């Protein structure tokens, strides 16, 4: 709907490494808007507070450098889960 109306989508993410990876995969698949030869860069707003489920849940967590993040590669969302940390939070 946003693309059909030439509206830019900027996802907001708050939560775990899994949500971060899913949001990045979504962002990577959004079309460029506005439709031009010089599209706006993709933007993502996300929480930077301390959160072990975002920074330690994935064995290779998403990090940013100079305002840029790398989209995880690999099967599914591209994450390998830190099962030791996960078991710490399991009920």
Which stretches of residues belong to each language-model region?
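Shared catalytic-loop signature of beta/alpha-barrel
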Residues: 1-68
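C-terminal extensions of enzymes
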Residues: 51-91
